[in-house]
């Protein structure tokens, strides 16, 4: 069985660097079912939507939640971080983004997420990962379409 070209291996949430993660969710190639025990019978409040939004945030989306929720999470976790290990063509990238006050963003090939959260390395931004995804996965037609949107067409 071949591994997918792009897949998320792990999502981690820290209240602050140096502490044990609040959540460390391992994933595997293929279908992963995200569920929570349904104590009230309605399935709300388990964090499934936020989990998906955090994945998108680590893959380059600007915001991980609507403004009121971001403000609440930022107030509760002013030093909070979310990290993701994403595998692209066999290379595991470590991605780290802030949850609280504005800080640095990182995307490091062959990086170790547990070491990256503690490091003082210079900011990389997400461009290294996003450029690698664009260069390695997207067809020329899709790349041209994205370039047109970036230029305002």
Where are these regions (language model features)?
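Glycine-rich phosphate-binding loops of NTPases
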Residues: 101-153
């Amino acid at each position: 069985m071949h591994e997918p070209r792009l897949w998320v291996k792990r999502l981690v949430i820290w209240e602050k660097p140096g502490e044990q993660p609040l959540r460390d969710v391992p994933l595997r190639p293929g279908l992963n079912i995200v569920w929570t025990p349904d104590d009230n019978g309605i399935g709300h409040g388990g964090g499934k939507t936020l989990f998906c939004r955090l994945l998108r945030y680590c893959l380059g989306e600007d915001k991980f939640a609507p403004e009121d929720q971001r403000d609440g999470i930022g107030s509760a976790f002013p030093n909070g971080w979310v990290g993701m290990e994403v595998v692209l063509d066999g290379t595991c990238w470590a991605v780290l983004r802030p949850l609280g006050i504005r800080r640095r963003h990182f995307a490091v090939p062959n990086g170790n997420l547990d070491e990256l959260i503690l490091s003082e390395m210079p900011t990389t931004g997400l461009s290294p990962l996003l450029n690698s995804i664009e260069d390695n996965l997207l067809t020329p037609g899709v790349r041209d379409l994205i370039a047109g949107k970036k230029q305002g067409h």
